[in-house]
Each structure stands twice: as structure tokens, then as C-alpha cells.
């Protein structure tokens, strides 16, 4: 019973404090275009304050964006493809 009550208290907090992944958009609704991963990592971490980023399908894909940051609406297949972070 105690476990169930703890679960009910902690579960909503996890949803509020969660981070999201996606193509971050600027104030004009455009995504940063790219060819190199290092460029995207700099854009994502310094401009959008994400934890990291890389170039996925010629646009910067950011990991660990705050919930209040706007992201581009994409298909689930594209999101699952880009969620696999390339090492290197």
C-alpha cells in the first residue's frame, strides 16, 4: 500500500520534470540546417540549452530540451529514427 501511495506522488512529478527531444525551432518557426554533428551540438547546447544535439536528416536534432521549448511536429517514424543518437 505504501508503494502505491509513493508511486501516486512521484509519477506526476516525473512528468513535470521530464525533458523532450526534437528539432528545436526558433521564433520564426524554422529549424537549424546542418551537415556536421559538432555544429548541431553547439546550437542545441548554447542556443536552446539542451543537453546535446546532432545532425539528423540535415537538421539539428536536440536531446534534453526543456518542456517550454518549441519543437517541430514530425512523424513518429522520423522521431524514433532520430532518437537513436549516433556516437562520434
UniProtKB/Swiss-Prot annotation:
Listed SUPFAM superfamilies: Scorpion toxin-like (SSF57095)
Alphabetical UniProt keywords: Amidation, Disulfide bond, Ion channel impairing toxin, Neurotoxin, Secreted, Signal, Toxin, Voltage-gated sodium channel impairing toxin
LCN-type CS-alpha/beta domain residues: 20-83
Residue numbers carrying Isoleucine amide: 87
Transmembrane segments: none
Domain of life: Eukaryota
GO terms classed as biological process: defense response
InterPro entries according to UniProt: LCN-type_CS_alpha_beta_dom, Scorpion_toxin-like, Scorpion_toxin-like_sf, Scorpion_toxinL/defensin
Main location: secreted
One family name in Pfam for this protein: Toxin_3
GO molecular function term, any single one: sodium channel inhibitor activity
Coiled-coil segments: none
A Gene Ontology term for the protein's cellular component: extracellular region
Secretion signal, residue range per the UniProt entry: 1-18
Compartment(s) where it occurs, according to its Swiss-Prot or TrEMBL record: Secreted
Intrachain S-S bonds: 34-55, 40-60, 44-62, 56-82
Tissue: Expressed by the venom gland.
Primary role: Excitatory insect beta-toxins induce a spastic paralysis. They bind voltage-independently at site-4 of sodium channels (Nav) and shift the voltage of activation toward more negative potentials thereby affecting sodium channel activation and promoting spontaneous and repetitive firing. This toxin is active only on insects.
Family, per entry: Belongs to the long (4 C-C) scorpion toxin superfamily. Sodium channel inhibitor family. Beta subfamily.
UniProt free text on domains: Has the structural arrangement of an alpha-helix connected to antiparallel beta-sheets by disulfide bonds (CS-alpha/beta).
Protein name: Beta-insect excitatory toxin BmKIT1
Amino acid at each position: 500500500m505504501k508503494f502505491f501511495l509513493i508511486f501516486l506522488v512521484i509519477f506526476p512529478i516525473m512528468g513535470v520534470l521530464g525533458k523532450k527531444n526534437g528539432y528545436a525551432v526558433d521564433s520564426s518557426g524554422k529549424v537549424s540546417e546542418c551537415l556536421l554533428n559538432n555544429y548541431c551540438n553547439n546550437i542545441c547546447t548554447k542556443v536552446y540549452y539542451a543537453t546535446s544535439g546532432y545532425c539528423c536528416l540535415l537538421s539539428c536534432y536536440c536531446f534534453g530540451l526543456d518542456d517550454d521549448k518549441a519543437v517541430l511536429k514530425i512523424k513518429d517514424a522520423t522521431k524514433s529514427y532520430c532518437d537513436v543518437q549516433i556516437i562520434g
